[in-house]
UniProtKB/Swiss-Prot annotation:
Protein name (Swiss-Prot/TrEMBL): Probable endonuclease 4
Matches recorded under NCBIfam families: nfo
Amino-acid positions noted as binding Zn(2+) 2 in the UniProt annotation, renumbered to this chain: 145, 179, 216, 261
PROSITE patterns membership: AP_NUCLEASE_F2_1 (PS00729), AP_NUCLEASE_F2_2 (PS00730), AP_NUCLEASE_F2_3 (PS00731), AP_NUCLEASE_F2_4 (PS51432)
A Pfam family that the UniProt record links to this protein: AP_endonuc_2
Amino acids binding Zn(2+) 3: 182, 229, 231
Gene3D superfamilies assigned to the protein according to its UniProt record, in alphabetical order: Divalent-metal-dependent TIM barrel enzymes
Species of the source: Trichlorobacter lovleyi (strain ATCC BAA-1151 / DSM 17278 / SZ)
Organism superkingdom: Bacteria
EC main group: hydrolase
One of the protein's GO biological processes: base-excision repair
Alphabetized UniProt keyword annotations: DNA damage, DNA repair, Endonuclease, Hydrolase, Metal-binding, Nuclease, Zinc
Keyword Methyltransferase: no
Function (record text): Endonuclease IV plays a role in DNA repair. It cleaves phosphodiester bonds at apurinic or apyrimidinic (AP) sites, generating a 3'-hydroxyl group and a 5'-terminal sugar phosphate.
Length: 281
């Protein structure tokens, strides 16, 4: 597919199967978990599996494949077991992506849990400085994802993401993944032309539009500023179709991957429905 619309696909049956699923759904881009998203230790990727994934992707016609880190990782956690496991797991993810030829990893900045956002952000900064130094084989980027700000989750504001990037010794290693559901739930109104223009101007001023390297395309079950992360099919939630229309027609984002994370339905059938709707805008 010539455009950059895509979806998150399962790796059930092997990493290369995600590529087959993306092509079958009519995707131009792809996002995957490289292992089970709810286990700290993943099955090591064999050389055979890595080669098969690389060759499948090269032959697929897909523009790009992006990894998403596992849900358990919390690099904002205070010192202790969760932080230690998170550092190890993200380091493993970086090493795996290097072997698979994936050069972008989307991640949630994490939760500060019991103290302050400022303390949590400092821990994220420290974690990435350590990870970049300890995993030189991964030469790609980490894409910090905008979040809805549930509970003590970090990344609700562009300013928090800016703090991580500016605080790191390696600011050039970061990009941003803009989740349409999360930003709306966080209070950024992209549902009107004026609101969309204002949000993108804020993003450009604080982070730089050149860092916006991926979209997660999700409608929201909850309202503007709700700080609740609940994805909905495109056009069936509180965002409506306009934010997606604005992005699809924005010349600045033509070659930026736009990844669906909406409910799948039977046999991933809803991916094709959502992709067709987006292409009709």
């Amino acid at each position: 597919m010539s455009d950059y619309l895509g979806a998150h696909m399962s790796i059930a049956g092997g990493l290369h199967k995600s590529v087959e699923r993306a092509v079958a759904a009519g995707c131009g881009t792809l996002q995957i978990f490289t292992r089970s998203s709810n286990q700290w230790k993943g099955k090591p990727v064999s050389d055979k599996d890595a080669d098969l994934f690389r060759s499948s992707f090269a032959a697929s016609g897909l523009h790009e494949v992006i990894s998403h880190d596992i849900y358990l990782i919390n690099l904002a956690a205070p010192a202790g077991d969760t932080r230690d496991k998170s550092l190890a797991a993200f380091g493993d993810e970086m090493a795996t992506c290097a072997r698979l030829g994936i050069n972008k990893i989307v991640m949630h900045p994490g939760s500060h849990t019991t103290d302050s956002p400022e303390a949590g952000l400092e821990r994220v900064i420290s974690a990435f400085d350590q990870l970049f130094e300890q995993t030189p084989e991964y030469e790609g980027l980490v894409l910090l994802e905008t979040t809805a700000g549930q509970g003590t989750n970090l990344g609700r504001t562009f300013e928090e993401l800016q703090t991580i990037i500016n605080g790191s010794k390696y600011p050039d290693r970061f990009g941003i993944c803009f989740d349409t559901c999360h930003t709306f739930a966080a209070g950024y109104n992209t549902a009107t032309p004026e609101g969309y223009a204002d949000v993108m101007a804020q993003f450009d001023r604080l982070l730089g539009l050149e860092r916006l390297l991926c979209f997660h395309f999700n409608d929201s079950k909850k309202g503007l500023g709700s700080r609740v992360d609940r994805h909905e099919h495109i056009g069936q939630g509180t965002l409506g179709l306009e934010p997606f229309r604005f992005i699809m027609h924005d010349p600045r984002f033509i070659t930026v991957p736009k990844i669906l994370e909406t409910p799948k339905g039977d046999d991933d059938a809803m991916d094709q429905v959502n992709l067709a709707l987006l292409r009709s805008l």
